[in-house]
Amino acid sequence: MSAGTGRRIRVVVVDDSALVRSLLTAIVNEAPDMEVVATASDPIIAREKIRETSPDVVTLDVEMPRMDGLEFLRRLMRLRPTPVLMISSLTDAGSETTLAALELGAVDFIHKPADDIARHMQEYAEEIREKLRVTAEARLRQPNRFRQPPPARKTGPGAPLRKNALVFVGASTGGTEAIKDFLMGMPADGPPILIVQHMPEHFTFTFAERLNKLCPMRVKEAEDGEAALAGVAYIAPGHSHMRVAPAGGGGFRIALDQEEPVNRHRPAVDPLFDSAARHLGKNAIGVILTGMGKDGAEGLLRMRHAGAVTFGQDEASCVVYGMPREAFRIGAVAHVLPLNRLAEKVVECLQSQAERAIT
């Protein structure tokens, strides 16, 4: 049931494939707390169905006849803001379009393969239902609210940054835009930033490329064994856990592995934060952003116990206040801040630590 109303979550399914509409309808209607109230084969029909049924969440395919899915999403968010779960193909083009949809206001996405869609969707039926529940309760991002990062900061001679620190970031639902806003506020010459965003394999490379075009720092998908360098933000690949490990000369390197999922995710945030606590202690800064579930909370607590400064995104600016809530609940978060102030405070922390080191 919808947490706010106690009634079933009302879903409208929009997809040009009759098979996908049928599969999603069956998956939704198998759950006692949700129901499909309408389906549509294209955005023109969907517009009328949404107006008639006032759904809690819409599933939306990107590639549809009569109107591009992104254009429909753009209009929907402007005229009748509604939580949207995107349906995306696992291709480079699909990942680029999905990231554009998240930027336009979609809450999350599920991916469908090119072959054997029926078996794949049945295997992930419970994950689809869980994403629908989270999407229905998500806080929609408002235009120009919590979205305007501070201007890119250049550190001058009077504001040195601590050089031996590393910054670690974890996020899930809503995280693609939150990470972008955070990195937009970090200076080009900042310390290495290691980031885990729950995302499939084909999407993380595209995500890193997209951020690299927008942010002051260089942003790239992480590679196993490479040095963690200042001025670079590293995105964990969608198929691997990412950890930090000591390297020669007092530096650090990135270690990737394909061990079992943690908290149902690979990459997961906890392995990254655990490695930061183990190898960096007080030389680490941890940041936990919007996302459902508990991944990262225990690792952030271990970072704090090891001496790291820890930050959590506040409830008001989160799309889904799950991971930061759990981290705050167990005492892992030292500083709670809105998204548009997190980068500023992390930079201030790095500057104050540098000043203390000098004196």
UniProtKB/Swiss-Prot annotation:
Disulphide bridges: none
Reaction catalysed by this enzyme: [protein]-L-glutamate 5-O-methyl ester + H2O = L-glutamyl-[protein] + methanol + H(+); L-glutaminyl-[protein] + H2O = L-glutamyl-[protein] + NH4(+)
Residue ranges of every copy of the CheB-type methylesterase domain listed in the record: 160-353
First-listed, main subcellular location of the protein, grouped into a coarse class: cytoplasm
One record GO biological process: chemotaxis
GO cellular component assignments: cytoplasm
Enzyme Commission number(s) of this protein: 3.1.1.61, 3.5.1.44
UniProt modification remark: Phosphorylated by CheA. Phosphorylation of the N-terminal regulatory domain activates the methylesterase activity.
Active-site positions on this chain: 172, 198, 295
Modification sites for 4-aspartylphosphate: 61
Protein location: Cytoplasm
Protein name per UniProt: Protein-glutamate methylesterase/protein-glutamine glutaminase 3
Organism whose genome encodes this protein: Chromobacterium violaceum (strain ATCC 12472 / DSM 30191 / JCM 1249 / CCUG 213 / NBRC 12614 / NCIMB 9131 / NCTC 9757 / MK)
Organism lineage: Bacteria, Pseudomonadati, Pseudomonadota, Betaproteobacteria, Neisseriales
